[in-house]
């Protein structure tokens, strides 16, 4: 099992979580192919992090699976923009921390469903 972490990426966590949920549990090769054609910034960022996780564990992309893909909120960068009558309003620029965990296909059993089955005695 190998991991990759990208911190402080200038990306909205709510928008990135939509894409992260789609690729969780997918084959790595299929996930990277689908992320390259996703028409937003989160697709490009997640594609690079998944590729990095595969390279970190020196795994084969054809047989590896994405065990978990998590996007956490990072610090919010605040900027001000001038407005009428001498006022200024705040602009929020959110950042994210992207965490991807990749494993060989047979290790996918270590998910929540496997733990639940063990608790039930199956």
From Swiss-Prot:
Gene3D superfamilies: Ribosomal protein L22/L17 (3.90.470.10). Pfam families: Ribosomal_L22. Part of the 50S ribosomal subunit. GO terms for biological process: translation. Keywords: Ribonucleoprotein, Ribosomal protein, RNA-binding, rRNA-binding. GO terms for molecular function: rRNA binding; structural constituent of ribosome. This protein binds specifically to 23S rRNA; its binding is stimulated by other ribosomal proteins, e.g. L4, L17, and L20. It is important during the early stages of 50S assembly. It makes multiple contacts with different domains of the 23S rRNA in the assembled 50S subunit and ribosome. It comes from Helicobacter acinonychis (strain Sheeba). It comes from the Bacteria. The gene is rplV. Residues 103-122 are annotated as: Disordered. This is Large ribosomal subunit protein uL22.
């Amino acid at each position: 099992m190998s991991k990759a972490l990208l911190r402080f990426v200038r990306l909205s966590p709510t928008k990135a979580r939509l894409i992260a949920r789609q690729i969780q549990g997918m084959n790595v090769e299929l996930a990277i192919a689908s992320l390259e054609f996703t028409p937003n910034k989160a697709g490009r960022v997640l594609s690079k992090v998944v590729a990095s996780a595969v390279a970190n564990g020196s795994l084969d992309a054809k047989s590896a699976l994405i065990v978990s893909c998590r996007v956490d909120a990072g610090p919010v960068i605040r900027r001000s923009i001038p407005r009428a009558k001498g006022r200024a309003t705040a602009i929020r620029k959110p950042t994210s921390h992207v965490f991807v965990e990749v494993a060989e296909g047979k290790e996918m059993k270590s998910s929540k469903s496997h733990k639940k089955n063990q608790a039930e005695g199956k």
